[in-house]
C-alpha cells in the first residue's frame, strides 16, 4: 500500500499534478500510504471514461447487469477479512465491528440492487380514441459519489449499488482521510466483469470535490458528510442543475420510557453512542431518560461504560478504537471541556487514553454527561465522538417537543413496552430514520435519509432507484395527424 493512484477505466492512472497526500493509521500515527491527488486532468479523464463505460453498461440487458453486480457482492464477501483489516488500518475502528458490518452490509446492498436491475420499469395508460402513453425510467448518466471517512467502503457501496443497477456510471471520491478501500472496491468491480469506466475512483481533498460539483458533464452528486459541507456541495451543484442526494449530520434523540428494562435501555444507549467510537451520523447522542428510572439507568450505564475495552483496533477483543485523527480528537476533547464549563456532570470518561501503548493514537474514553440541559453545547452540536448526554424528562408531550428542538432530523428512537405509545411518539418525531426498541439497524431494503437539515433524498430501498433514474413520457397517437394548418 506504499503508493496509491487514481483508478480510471479499469486500471491505475498516474496523476499529473505531482501533488500527493498521506493517509495515517489513527491508532498509531504511522503513515499507511501516500496517495496521488487528482486535479482537473484526472477528473476529465474519469468523466470521459465514464461516458464510454456508461454507454456500454446501459446497453447491456438488466439481467446481465444484475449478474455482474451479484458477482461483485460474492467477491466482496470472499475478501471480507482482508478488506475489513484494511478498513481498520485507515479508520481506527475495531476489527470486531468492521469484520461483521462494514463490508458485509455493503455487499448486502450490492446484492439487493443486483436483484432489482430487471425490476426498473415504467407505466402505460390507454387514453382512448387511439391514444396512449407510456413512461420509461432511464439512467441519469454519470453520477458522482463523495464519501465520508467513518464507513468508507460501505458508503461507496451504498452509492454505487443503486447507481449502477439503474445503468449509470459512477465517479467516486472517498474522503482524503480514508482513501484506500474504495480502490479495492473498484478492483473487485473490474474482476466481476463491470465494463471499464463504469466505476472510477479519484482521490483528493475538498478541492477535488469542488471540481466534481462544478463539472458540467456530471449529472448527479450523492454526498455523505457534514451539514456545512453539504450545503456547499449543493450550492455548487445548482450551477449546472445537478440532481443531489445529501446524507448529512444528526443530533438524534432516543427516548426511554420507564417500562423499559434498565439493562436493555443501557444496552441501547451504549450502542447508539459508542459504536465506531461515536463516529456515526445516526448516533443517539441525546438520551432522554424518564425521571423514574434515571438513577438506576445512570448507575448501570457508568459501570458498563467504564468496563469497555479500549485498545488496538486489530485485537478482536477491542470494543473502542481510535478516532479518525488527532485533529478530530482535539475537537471532541474541546466539546468535553465545553460541557464541563456549561455545568454538565461528568459521569465517566472524558479524557484521552494514553496507557498501554496508545499514546501515539487518537483514543478518547467513552464519555457520559448527566445533569444536562437542552442548551448545552454538547447537547446542541454534532460532536461525532463517544460523548453521550443524558437528559431527564417526566412528560411525553414535553419530551417530544424537546426531541424535535433541533435543526437536524436524521434519526430518532423510542424505547418502551407500550406499543401504542411507541407508535404515537414515533409519529410525532421529526426524523427520517426511526427505531422502536432498536438502534442502528439499516437493512438494504429500507430507505434511509434525513428530515430538515439532515439531508435530501434517500439511500437504499426501492425508492433510491428513483433518485438515480429520470422519467421519460412517450405519447402515442394511432390516428392521422390533426392540424389547423
Curated annotation (Swiss-Prot):
GO terms for biological process: glycine betaine biosynthetic process from choline. NAD(+) binds at residues 147-149, 173-176, 226-229, 249, 281, 382. InterPro entries: Ald_DH/histidinol_DH (IPR016161), Ald_DH_C (IPR016163), Ald_DH_CS_CYS (IPR016160), Ald_DH_CS_GLU (IPR029510), Ald_DH_N (IPR016162), Aldehyde_DH_dom (IPR015590), BADH (IPR011264). It holds the Pfam family Aldedh. Pathway: Amine and polyamine biosynthesis; betaine biosynthesis via choline pathway; betaine from betaine aldehyde: step 1/1. Transmembrane segments: none annotated. The modification Cysteine sulfenic acid (-SOH) is found at residue 281. PANTHER family: ALDEHYDE DEHYDROGENASE-RELATED. This is Betaine aldehyde dehydrogenase. It comes from Marinomonas sp. (strain MWYL1). The gene is betB.
Amino acid at each position: 500500500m506504499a503508493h496509491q493512484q487514481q483508478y480510471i477505466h479499469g486500471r491505475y492512472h498516474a496523476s499529473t499534478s505531482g501533488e500527493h497526500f498521506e493517509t495515517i493509521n489513527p491508532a498509531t500515527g504511522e503513515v499507511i500510504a501516500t496517495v496521488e491527488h487528482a486535479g482537473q486532468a484526472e477528473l476529465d479523464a474519469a468523466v470521459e471514461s465514464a461516458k464510454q463505460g456508461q454507454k456500454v453498461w446501459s446497453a447491456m440487458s438488466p439481467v446481465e447487469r444484475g449478474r455482474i453486480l451479484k458477482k461483485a457482492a460474492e467477491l466482496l464477501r470472499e475478501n471480507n477479512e482482508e478488506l475489513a483489516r484494511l478498513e481498520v488500518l485507515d479508520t481506527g475502528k475495531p476489527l470486531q465491528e468492521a469484520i461483521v458490518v462494514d463490508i458485509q452490509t455493503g455487499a448486502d446492498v450490492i446484492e439487493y440492487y443486483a436483484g432489482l436491475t430487471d425490476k426498473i420499469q415504467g407505466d402505460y395508460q390507454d387514453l382512448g380514441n387511439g391514444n396512449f402513453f407510456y413512461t420509461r425510467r432511464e439512467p441519469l448518466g454519470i453520477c458522482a459519489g463523495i464519501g465520508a471517512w467513518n464507513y468508507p467502503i460501505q458508503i461507496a457501496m451504498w452509492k454505487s449499488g443503486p447507481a449502477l443497477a439503474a445503468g449509470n456510471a459512477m465517479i467516486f471520491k472517498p474522503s482524503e482521510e480514508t482513501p484506500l478501500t474504495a480502490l479495492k472496491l473498484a478492483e473487485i468491480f473490474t474482476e466481476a466483469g463491470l465494463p471499464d469506466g463504469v466505476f472510477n475512483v479519484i482521490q483528493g481533498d475538498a478541492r477535488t470535490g469542488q471540481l466534481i460539483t462544478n463539472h458540467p458533464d456530471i449529472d448527479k452528486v450523492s454526498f455523505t458528510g457534514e451539514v456545512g459541507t453539504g450545503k456547499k456541495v449543493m450550492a455548487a451543484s445548482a450551477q449546472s442543475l445537478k440532481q443531489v442526494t445529501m446524507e448529512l449530520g444528526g443530533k438524534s434523540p432516543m427516548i426511554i420510557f420507564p417500562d423499559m428494562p434498565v439493562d436493555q435501555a443501557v444496552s441501547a444507549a451504549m450502542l447508539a453512542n459508542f459504536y465506531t467510537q461515536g463516529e456515526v451520523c445516526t448516533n443517539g447522542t441525546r438520551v432522554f431518560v424518564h425521571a423514574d428510572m434515571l438513577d438506576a439507568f445512570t448507575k448501570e450505564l457508568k459501570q458498563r461504560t467504564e468496563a469497555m475495552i479500549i485498545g488496538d483496533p486489530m485485537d478482536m477483543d477491542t470494543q473502542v478504537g481510535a478516532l479518525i485523527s488527532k485533529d478530530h480528537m482535539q475537537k471532541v476533547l474541546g466539546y468535553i471541556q465545553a460541557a464541563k464549563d456549561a455545568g454538565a456532570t461528568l459521569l465517566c470518561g472524558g479524557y484521552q487514553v494514553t496507557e498501554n501503548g496508545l499514546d501515539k493514537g487518537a483514543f478518547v474514553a467513552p464519555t457520559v454527561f448527566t445533569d444536562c440541559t437542552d442548551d448545552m453545547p454538547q447537547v446542541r452540536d454534532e460532536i461525532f465522538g463517544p460523548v453521550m448526554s443524558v437528559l431527564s424528562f417526566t412528560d411525553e408531550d414535553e419530551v417530544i417537543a424537546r426531541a424535535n428542538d433541533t435543526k437536524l432530523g436524521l434519526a430518532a428512537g423510542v424505547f418502551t413496552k407500550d406499543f401504542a405509545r411507541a407508535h404515537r411518539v414515533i409519529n410525532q418525531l421529526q426524523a427520517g430514520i426511526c427505531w422502536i426498541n432498536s438502534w442502528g439497524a439499516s437493512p438494504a431494503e429500507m430507505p434511509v435519509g434525513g428530515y430538515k437539515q439532515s439531508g435530501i433524498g434517500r439511500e437504499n430501498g426501492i425508492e433510491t432507484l428513483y433518485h438515480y433514474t429520470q422519467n421519460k413520457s412517450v405519447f402515442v397517437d394511432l390516428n392521422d395527424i390533426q392540424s389547423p394548418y
